Amino acid sequence: MIKVGICDTTFARYDMGGAAIDEIKKHATGIKIIRRTVPGIKDLPVACKKLIEEEGCEMVMALGMPGPEEKDKVCAHEASTGLIQAQLMTNTHILEVFVHEDEEDDPEDLKVLADNRAREHAQNLIMMLFRPERLTRDAGMGMREGKPDVGPL
């Protein structure tokens, strides 16, 4: 059985981890999901690394919702850098799934974006694990997670 890690935060205003888990369960079998929740996005890198090294996860999703302030953007960048370092240290993919609070003005639109992005990245995880040829087929197609695809040039 393949182990997959889901790591999310209490700072987020939407349960993206729950949406990702729901999506994985709908579209894949033979996966054991291990979920960890941390306070904020800067806690994600070590939590994801622990899921890989201590729990044996073959792939991890890191889900977070940085706030709208400049300091939140700095924290998001630091978290992203940490996630990249964790990937390189463990030779394991960590799918970064961030939705910035200022991506949408309306809270309902932000909720829809967070749900869609979490679910579409969960589908990416499934494809990376079980159908990598699908991703190759879609290379250069302008695919977007959470918002409409923009298409190829």
Swiss-Prot record:
Keywords, alphabetical: Magnesium, Riboflavin biosynthesis, Transferase
Name recorded for this polypeptide: Riboflavin synthase
InterPro entries in UniProt: LS/RS, LS/RS_sf, Ribfl_synth_arc
Activity regulation as described: Inhibited by EDTA.
Alphabetized GO MF terms: riboflavin synthase activity
BP term (GO), one: riboflavin biosynthetic process
Function: The relatively low activity of this enzyme suggested that 6,7-dimethyl-8-ribityllumazine might not be its natural substrate.
